[in-house]
Every structure is written in structure tokens, then in C-alpha cells.
A protein has these predicted regions:
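Residue-level detector of Asp-centered blade-edge/turn motifs that repeat once per structural unit
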Residues: 28-33, 54-56, 99-100, 141-142, ...
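Short loop/turn segments that connect beta-strands within beta-propeller blades
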Residues: 74-77, 118-121, 160-163, 202-205, ...
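WD40-repeat beta-propellers
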Residues: 69-73, 113-116, 155-158, 197-200, ...
Length: 330
């Protein structure tokens, strides 16, 4: 029996928001390590402590056109709201989660960018974006910066600590719809309204590659966990894989019948997932570049997809206001 036959819809949450859900994330907060205790006897007791106390906290984050962000926990097969975050006055466009899983960044149609504590639901700070439209977000791998695309074709780099804009990378192009930071911290990639992809060297702050493989808007892009590949998704219905260092096209993936709105790699780097306006979620194998499975459980376009930290589950969100969680065994 093929492992793909074991893929199934684990949970569906209808009407999770009052309007379309545009973005999602999956946070994994690891427990704080206990300080080393000098007394050996006490140390032995701490080592024998209940392992359940050491388990990570897993949260699903969703942002909607209803201006609301929700932090969910999966308990006993049910999705339960832990926090409802209110601070944006218009629809939530993008959410990004810091590498340690503790901090959430959110952007909105109201041009605001807000940082939140995921575990407590507390608003940490509102970034100083000025009058610039902020769009898709990503964290730097060290968690010190948040990057955003903008309507002016620029990539904005904000300091998490100060809340201020530290740097701007000019793509000299159209509206920057999507941005991604490479996991090794060396590159930032952007996708534009005209289908052009730019790759910048972070240290030098300069453009190193321009990729012109798509003819329509790039709504999502992401780096592979080893930072060697860049995956792009476009309204032309295709996805493309590029070798980051040499900017060579490694492959074109087709299968969606309409716009590809969201893509994400699995943390183990073996698979990636795509969501489309054709209402499907597709799981792809990186080695073969073949589609492993197609989920057809949404009734409208799929705006967001993400893997969990174990790479064995996927969350998707849609215009149909629902959240789907799929079991995708390794």
C-alpha cells in the first residue's frame, strides 16, 4: 500500500472566522531548559521528571478578512481558540512566526505590522511602517528582523527589538507581493506583481539574481530548509524550483488548474505543499517533483498552507472560512 493512501483529512473547522481566511501558520514552542542544578541529588530528580511536562506547545495561527487573528490549539481532535488577537482595522494579509515559535508578526490592509506573544496573546509592539503598504511577512532566521513586501516594489526590513525600519532593499520593480528569508540567513527573495523574482545578498544588501520564469503575479515563494532551492508560485498556475546560488531553473511543476496562492516546504525538506484558487491542496515530493496527493476538501480558493514542525501534518485555510488539517505520514 502506498503511503499516500494514508493521507487523509484529520479535521475540518467550518466558519473558523466570520470572513475569508487569508493566511496561516504553525508554531511550535519548546519548553525552557531547566538550569543546571549543582546538587546531584536534585539534578537526578529533575532528570526523572515527568516527560509530559517537557512537551512542546503547538499552535495554529489564522488571519482573516474579518480583521482578526486567532491562535488555536488542537486538543483531543478539536480545534479550540486559545487567543483572539484584535489590533488591525482591516483584513489580515500575512502572518509569520519567529524561529523559536514564540512571536507572531502580522500585517494588514490597514498598513500596520504588529508583533504578538503567541503563548499569552499579548500585543508586544506595533512597528513603525509609516504610510507604506506592508504585505507578506517573514522572520530572519535569527529572529531579530521581520521583512515585508510593499506596494512600492521595496523590501522593508524591520528590527524586532526597536520596532523601526532598519533597511530597505529596492527591487526596482512592481508591487512586491511575497518575500522570504533563506534559513541560512544569506538571501532574501521577493516575488512581484509582474511575475519577476529577485534574490538579494543580505550582507551586501545588493541584488544578485533576477528570475523571469513567470508571466503573472508571484503570490508566494519559499526557500528549502537547506537554503539551496527557491520555490515560487504564480497566478500562471505553475510552480518553479531554482538553484539559489546559480539561479538555474531546476524544475517546473504543473497540476493546479488555476492560480497557485500559497506554498510551503516541510521542515524535513522532503516535500512541499501548495494551495490554489482551484480549491485544492497538493502535496509534492521534492526528489521526484511529482504530486503525491490532492486534497479537495475546500469549497473555495485556498489562501494559505503550512506544515507542522514534525513534517507529518498540514494546515490549510480558505476563502470558504474553514481550517483543514491533514494527516500526511512520513
Amino acid at each position: 500500500m502506498s503511503i499516500t493512501t494514508l493521507y487523509y483529512l484529520l479535521l475540518k473547522k467550518e466558519n473558523a472566522h466570520e470572513d475569508s481566511i487569508w493566511c496561516c501558520g504553525w508554531s511550535n514552542i519548546k519548553p525552557e531548559k531547566k538550569k543546571q542544578v549543582e546538587n546531584e541529588e536534585i539534578n537526578e530528580i529533575s532528570q526523572d521528571s515527568n516527560p509530559e511536562e517537557e512537551q512542546s506547545e503547538s499552535y495554529i495561527i489564522t488571519g482573516g478578512l474579518d480583521d482578526i487573528i486567532k491562535v488555536w490549539q488542537l486538543n483531543n481532535g478539536k480545534l479550540e481558540v486559545k487567543h483572539q488577537l484584535e489590533g488591525h482595522s482591516l483584513g489580515v494579509i500575512s502572518v509569520a512566526i519567529s524561529p523559536d515559535g514564540k512571536t507572531l508578526a502580522s500585517s494588514s490592509q490597514d498598513s500596520s505590522l504588529i508583533l504578538w506573544d503567541i503563548a499569552t496573546g499579548e500585543k508586544l509592539k506595533t512597528m513603525e511602517t509609516g504610510a507604506t503598504d506592508v504585505w507578506t511577512l517573514d522572520f530572519s532566521p535569527d529572529g531579530k528582523n521581520v521583512i515585508s513586501g510593499s506596494n512600492a516594489g521595496k523590501i522593508l526590513i524591520f528590527s524586532v527589538e526597536s520596532g523601526k525600519q532598519e533597511q530597505t532593499l529596492d527591487t526596482r520593480g512592481k508591487f512586491t507581493l511575497s518575500v522570504a528569508y533563506s534559513p541560512d540567513g544569506k538571501y532574501i527573495a521577493s516575488g512581484a506583481l509582474d511575475g519577476i523574482v529577485k534574490i538579494f545578498d543580505v550582507v551586501q544588501g545588493k541584488l544578485v539574481h533576477t528570475l523571469e520564469g513567470h508571466a503573472k503575479p508571484i503570490r508566494s515563494l519559499c526557500f528549502s530548509p537547506d537554503s539551496q532551492l527557491l520555490l515560487t508560485a504564480s497566478d500562471d498556475g505553475h510552480m518553479k524550483l531554482y538553484d539559489v546560488v546559480h539561479a538555474n531553473l531546476a524544475g517546473t511543476l504543473s497540476g493546479h488548474a488555476s492560480w497557485v496562492l500559497s506554498i510551503a516546504f516541510s521542515p524535513d525538506g522532503k516535500r512541499f505543499v501548495s494551495g490554489s484558487s482551484d480549491r485544492t491542496v497538493r502535496v509534492w515530493d521534492l526528489d521526484t517533483m511529482q504530486c503525491q496527493h490532492v486534497f479537495k476538501e475546500h469549497n473555495d480558493q485556498v489562501w494559505g498552507v503550512k506544515f507542522n514542525s514534525e513534517s507529518n501534518k498540514i494546515v490549510s485555510v480558505s476563502e470558504d472560512k474553514s481550517i483543514n488539517i491533514y494527516d500526511c505520514p512520513l
